[in-house]
């Protein structure tokens, strides 16, 4: 993993291109049709528009298998690149190094090569984890020479007399990096009937109207990181398409939109296509035994069915390997662990040291 481009090792961008050229495939992602032109335009302009994502793997004596790609609004960067690095520097006396020790430098390098504007608004929800995640990215931006401001929630945003989007200091909002998932904005679009509009229903700027997430992220003049096209590789509907395009790829798991004969024989994981944080996942054995189940807010979504490939249990915890992509390349690795088979938002980040032999 250290020596190759993760985007090249897993043909996920090839699959993304295939989806965006085929209406029948794109329909599988449950994205409102009113956004399809925006999606395709975002993909056409993709060069230097993606900063970072995270791939989640299972790695054991059987080899390496990818579960999914968090291409949009990935997290765990702070824990891997800062907290564990401090531990490695001050609390660890053995050999080896933290494999995410250079993550902040990689992020800064990606920002330097991006097409971001000189001032970046960092948009986050009012969440403790997102607080430090936003601060870590702000440090990378500062290192890359950008000015920035963190916006917690949308309360500070408003319209000026000319109908432009501004922050509490009166600064124009035209470039943002977000911790919000694109799916949150897409859900806002779903709440408005598509038949009522010939264009994306964003507000154009009346001083008495509140600013919604879609009014920021879907404004044509606002450059957004991560870009809209990342909802395609970040949506689990990409996984059956990857398997169809590259069956038996050594890093992929058999995945389908139904429980096919092979999945019935191996057991399978049931996952909502736009689910997050390990929510609403069922693990079913080849004997139809429910091995684990999580709850959440994604129960109404379409599901995919992925070959059962359980995490290894090491010292009482099931351990997952997470690898960060930065500009499409390897940026670092961390481990997540849980006493249950499914890694969730509250699952631990485990210490990791790599020793070269």
Predicted regions: what they are:
Residues 1, 44-48, 273, 312-314:
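Short Gly/Pro-enriched turn/cap motifs at secondary-structure boundaries
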Residues 1-8:
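Single conserved hydrophobic/aromatic residue that forms the stacking wall/gate
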Residues 7, 52-54, 320:
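Extracellular structured ligand-interaction cores
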Residues 19-55, 129-131, 135, 139, ...:
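Extended, Lys/Arg-enriched charged tracts that mediate electrostatic binding to polyanionic substrates
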Residues 42-65, 69-77, 231:
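Short acidic, Gly/Ser-rich segments with clustered Asp/Glu that frequently serve as metal-coordination loops
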Residues 60-61, 73-79, 84-357:
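Domain-scale recognition of functional cores that engage charged ligands
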């Amino acid at each position: 993993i250290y020596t190759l481009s993760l985007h090249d090792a897993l043909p996920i961008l090839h699959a993304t291109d295939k989806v965006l050229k085929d209406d029948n495939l794109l329909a599988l992602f449950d994205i409102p049709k009113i956004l399809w032109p925006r999606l395709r335009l975002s993909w056409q302009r993709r060069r230097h528009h993606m900063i970072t994502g995270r791939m989640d793997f299972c790695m054991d004596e059987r080899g390496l298998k990818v579960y999914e790609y968090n291409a949009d609004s990935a997290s765990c960067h702070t824990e891997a690149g800062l907290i564990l690095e401090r531990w490695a520097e001050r609390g660890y006396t053995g050999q080896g190094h933290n494999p995410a020790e250079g993550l902040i430098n990689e992020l800064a390098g990606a920002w330097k090569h991006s097409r971001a504007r000189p001032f970046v608004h960092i948009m986050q929800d009012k969440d403790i984890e997102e607080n430090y995640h936003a601060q870590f990215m702000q440090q990378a931006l500062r290192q890359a020479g950008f000015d920035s401001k963190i916006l917690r929630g949308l309360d500070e945003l408003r319209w000026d007399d000319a109908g432009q989007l501004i922050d509490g200091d009166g600064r124009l909002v035209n470039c943002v990096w977000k911790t919000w998932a694109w799916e949150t904005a897409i859900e806002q679009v779903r709440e408005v009937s598509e038949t009522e509009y010939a264009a994306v229903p964003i507000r154009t700027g009346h001083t008495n109207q509140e600013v919604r997430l879609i009014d920021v992220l879907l404004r044509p003049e606002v450059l957004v990181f991560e870009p809209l096209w990342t909802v395609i590789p970040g949506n689990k509907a990409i996984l059956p398409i990857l398997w169809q395009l590259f069956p038996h790829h050594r890093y992929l798991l058999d995945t389908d939109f139904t429980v096919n004969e092979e999945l019935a024989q191996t057991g399978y994981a049931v996952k909502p296509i736009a689910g997050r944080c390990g929510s609403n996942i069922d693990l079913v054995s080849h004997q139809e035994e429910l091995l684990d189940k999580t709850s959440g807010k994604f129960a109404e979504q379409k599901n995919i069915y992925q070959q059962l490939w359980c995490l290894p249990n090491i010292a009482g915890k099931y351990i997952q390997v997470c690898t960060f992509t930065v500009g499409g390349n390897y940026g670092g690795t961390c481990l997540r662990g849980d006493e249950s088979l499914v890694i969730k938002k509250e699952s631990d980040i485990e210490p990791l040291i790599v020793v070269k032999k």
